[in-house]
Regions:
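Basic, alpha-helical terminal appendages of large translation-related enzymes
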Residues: 1-32, 260, 272-277, 307, ...
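Conserved oxyanion/phosphate-binding beta-strand-loop segments in alpha/beta enzyme cores
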Residues: 1-36, 65-74, 98-105, 209, ...
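Residue patterns forming the tRNA-binding/recognition surfaces of aminoacyl-tRNA synthetases
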Residues: 2, 11, 15-19, 90-248, ...
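N-terminal catalytic cores of NTP/NDP-binding nucleotidyl/phosphoryl-transfer enzymes
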Residues: 25-95, 122-137, 245-246, 313-349, ...
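Catalytic alpha/beta core of large soluble enzyme barrels
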Residues: 57, 70, 263-364, 369
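Helix-rich, typically C-terminal accessory recognition domains appended to large enzymatic cores
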Residues: 78, 143-155, 159, 250, ...
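Amphipathic alpha-helical
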Residues: 194, 199-224, 260-304, 450-478, ...
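Alpha-helical recognition segments enriched in aromatics with Gly/Pro capping
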Residues: 308-314, 318-331, 360, 475-613
Length: 808
């Protein structure tokens, strides 16, 4: 028959707000559970990526509440920064007006989705009450030498007209607008995240349930390398060039060395060269290239012979010194030793420029003709006293020991991670609370004067320089130290600074005296469950981890990690790319709220595939979830009308067995974030209920009420509106009290969790009966993993009553 979703959903959304659903009392004696979805950029409407995120989060919130937890699940807005400002520019509306209008709209859409949050804790990064404390934390970092201003080659986006952090550049393009990024030398503000390289890497092992791919992405970005550092003297001078290598075992194979065009000795090298014109031209050309262009594997490497020689310290041989733009000044020492026999990039370079190639490692100790670099392990040759040693480890350790003994080198660890560039030449951001005084230099604003307010200006387009530099009343100020005339910093902060600590502010959103209370922070953090997109693995998640460690060392908090458990949802793609406002390919939920209802949309997001997988959006499946809810509506009403009996028959016993199996499987699947299988299990039970109703016209009242209450409670976290309405209409209760418990007498030793793997990795699971066959297990796998092409399966490994693994 169906139901009026518009009327029902509005009714329950109003009820949850009126009854303070989602409001958390931090002082409750219940076990705490901090459940947090990443807060959004309010730069447009909610899209399906948001809907997926907030549906997952709401399922966890409602489930944990019914399991007796004191759940904190707040919501706020990442409302400063490029996304909001660019959207405002496109619409011709001032960023503040645009942002606050979008916040109002997006909040309404979240409520229409049926998600419950503690709106009493709502925060917005652009609010003075919030960015006052962002500025205070910046000053704390500055006073503890964790924030500094310095010259550096930086990534510049001509379209966004601002500097970008390395993490915001994807394959040489701006992550926001896809414009080519080029290099500029500018004086910018940085956070010393590199100081925490070791700890950020080592403490990945202390995290709870984090996806391996996220930890791997952070590990690779931090990029720890172990090796040796030594000096190569420039012949006939007192100058030395330091080089770092991860392959000390190849040091006898050096046939040339390379420095970056920006190397600290580049001027001296040019002066020594007889090839000044070509060198200067090459240096000038390199300055116009982006880092991506310089490192791209697609382009042939270029360089210029300086005509200068350097000495290999291990054997005294002189080799040519080249300049090449594939060497970056801020990686390692800005100089490399080149061993073409055992590095493919060096091999290609040497072949191109006809440089000697000397083999020092061979497969079996015998020399051979090399048509490409030999990079495998082997035996050292042409290496004097080290001949015969095994590469890499044995020979490297011996050569490092010799370098140290001779006083010409040392073992060293280096990291790819560089300091976090936070300066932005944009208007819509948190002002950096620093002042430059002619006498005192850089001076932080006094805490009592915070916030340094972002002025209301109409001309916020930055045609040249920072927009705030044009505002005299903002720029001109007094030095806090000496009182003389001074000027304010006119860059604003990267919006990722705002989001690096927002999860702390939720605990004290209205405090004017402090950003957070350390006692409460230590009680409630780290966040028990964090939910958001995998695309934030390097940016937001790494920055937040740094922030917590820095604030700990300053003495403001005691914790060392912000998020104990992380669920990284897959992206919603549309038209082949991630659905996002910046790409203009969003699909708004409002039409579906109107046509099918929020519950149908929620269920479809949960049913479309494993939530960790990225999926291509199409709306065909939402018809199916709406039909399912219509059947639930009809079945529950029919069941409530079945006349009562004094005892249960075999059909009722079987229905109760099916119900308890479903309780067990749904509970297990929620705990394991396997939401797509929950929907399958609920659909299966609803079909069993339909069959039961066709065959039976009476049922014991206790059993009837148990089936209605427990079935609806299982559905409630996923589709809360219709579940609440059916509970109210049929059992006279407006709220679910507790999560259903399995009655073991119905399922004792009858079921187990079938693990479904693809290439040895768990992709799904299902509660099934003992003795389930391989054929049935395969059928379940096809049902739960529709995105897998089972025609590609090469081998099936089936272990009775345990797992099935498909090798593709």
């Amino acid at each position: 028959m169906g139901y009026d979703h518009k009327k029902i959903e509005k009714k329950w959304q109003d009820y949850w707000i009126k009854e303070n659903f989602g409001i958390c009392d931090l002082d409750s004696k219940k076990a705490k559970f901090y459940n947090l979805c990443m807060y959004p950029y309010p730069s447009g409407d909610l899209h399906m990526g948001h809907i997926r995120n907030y549906t997952l989060g709401d399922v966890i919130t409602r489930y944990k509440l019914l399991n007796g937890f004191n759940v904190l699940s707040p919501m706020g807005w990442d409302s400063f920064g490029l996304p909001a400002e660019n959207a405002a520019i496109q619409t011709g509306v001032h960023p503040r007006e645009f942002t606050e209008t979008r916040i109002e709209k997006m909040k309404l859409q979240i409520i229409q989705l049926g998600s419950i949050y503690d709106w009493n804790r709502e925060i917005a990064a652009h609010s003075e009450d919030y960015y006052k404390w962002t500025q205070a934390l910046f000053i704390n970092l500055y006073e503890n030498d964790l924030a500094y201003k310095g010259d550096a080659p930086v990534n510049w986006c001509d379209s966004c007209k601002t500097v970008l952090a390395n993490e915001q550049v994807v394959e040489g393009l701006c992550e926001r607008c896809d414009s080519t990024v080029r290099q500029e030398n500018l004086n910018q503000w940085f956070f010393r995240i590199s100081k925490y390289s070791d700890e950020l890497l080592d403490s990945l092992d202390t995290l709870g349930d984090w996806p391996d791919r996220v930890k791997s992405m952070q590990e690779n970005w931090i990029g720890k390398s172990s090796g040796a550092e030594f000096d190569m003297e420039i012949v006939d001078t007192n100058l030395k060039i330091s080089v770092f290598t991860t392959r000390p075992d190849t040091i006898f194979g050096i046939t040339f060395a390379v420095v970056s065009p920006e190397h600290e000795l580049i001027n001296e090298i040019v002066d020594l060269s007889t090839n000044k014109k070509d060198l200067n031209q090459y240096i000038a050309d390199a300055s116009t290239k982006s880092e991506f262009e310089r490192l791209s594997s697609k382009d042939e490497k270029t360089g210029v012979d300086t005509g200068v020689k350097v000495t290999n310290p291990i054997n005294g041989k002189e080799v040519p010194l080249w300049i090449a733009d594939y060497v970056l000044v801020n990686y390692g020492t800005g100089a490399i030793m080149a061993v073409p026999a055992h590095d493919q990039r060096d091999f290609d370079f040497a072949k191109k420029y006809k440089i000697d190639i000397v083999q020092v490692i061979s497969r079996d100790g015998n020399l051979e003709r090399l048509d490409e670099a030999y990079i495998e392990e082997g035996i050292l040759v042409n290496s004097e006293q080290f001949n015969g040693l095994k590469s890499h480890k044995e020979a490297s350790n011996s050569i490092i020991d010799w370098l140290k003994k001779e006083g010409i080198g040392k073992d060293l660890e280096t990291f790819r991670l560089r300091d976090w560039l936070i300066s932005r030449q944009r208007y819509w951001g948190c002002p950096i609370p620093m002042i430059e005084c002619p006498s005192c230099g850089l001076v932080p604003e006094e805490y009592i004067n915070l916030p340094v307010k972002l002025p209301e200006i109409e001309d916020y387009l930055n045609n040249e320089g920072s927009p705030l530099s044009k505002v005299d009343e903002f720029v001109k100020t007094k030095c806090p130290k000496c009182g003389s005339e001074a000027t304010r910093e006119t860059d604003t902060m990267d919006t990722f600074v705002d989001s690096s600590w927002y999860y702390m502010r939720y605990l004290f959103p209205n405090s004017n005296d402090f950003p957070f209370d350390s006692k409460t922070i230590n009680e409630w953090l780290p966040v028990d469950q964090y939910i958001g997109g995998v695309e934030h693995a390097i940016l937001h998640l790494l920055y937040s981890r740094f922030f917590v460690k820095a604030l700990r060392d300053i003495g403001l908090i005691d914790i060392s990690e912000p998020f104990q458990n992380l669920f990284a949802q897959g992206m919603i793609n549309f038209g082949g790319s991630k659905m996002s406002k910046s790409k203009g390919n969003i699909v708004s939920p409002e039409a579906y709220f109107d046509s099918h209802g929020a519950d149908s949309l929620r269920l479809y997001h949960l049913f479309m595939g494993p939530p960790s997988d990225s999926v291509e959006w199409n709306d065909r499946g939402i018809e199916g979830t709406r039909r399912f809810l219509n059947k639930v509506w009809d079945n529950v009403h029919l069941l409530s009308e079945v006349k009562p009996s004094s005892t249960d028959n075999d059909d009722t016993e079987n229905l109760l067995i099916e119900l308890n199996k479903t309780i067990k499987s749904v509970s297990n699947d929620i705990e394991n974030f396997e939401f797509n299988t929950i929907v399958s299990d609920l659909m299966k039970f609803n079909n069993s209920l339909s069959d039961y109703l066709k065959a039976n016209n009476d049922i014991c009242k206790e059993s009837r009420d148990s089936v209605i209450a427990n079935f609806l409670c299982l559905l409630y976290p996923l589709a809360p509106h219709i579940s609440s309405e059916l509970l109210d209409l049929n059992l006279g209760s407006r709220e679910f009290d507790v999560w259903p418990k399995v009655n073991e007498k119905y399922i004792l030793d009858k079921t187990f969790e079938l693990v479904i793997q693809v290439n040895g990795k768990k992709r799904a699971s299902k509660i099934v009966e003992y003795g389930t066959s391989e054929e049935s297990s395969t059928a379940f796998a096809k049902e739960l993993l529709p995105q897998i092409n089972f025609e590609d399966v090469k081998k099936v490994i089936f272990i009775d009553n345990k797992l099935i693994n498909f090798v593709i």
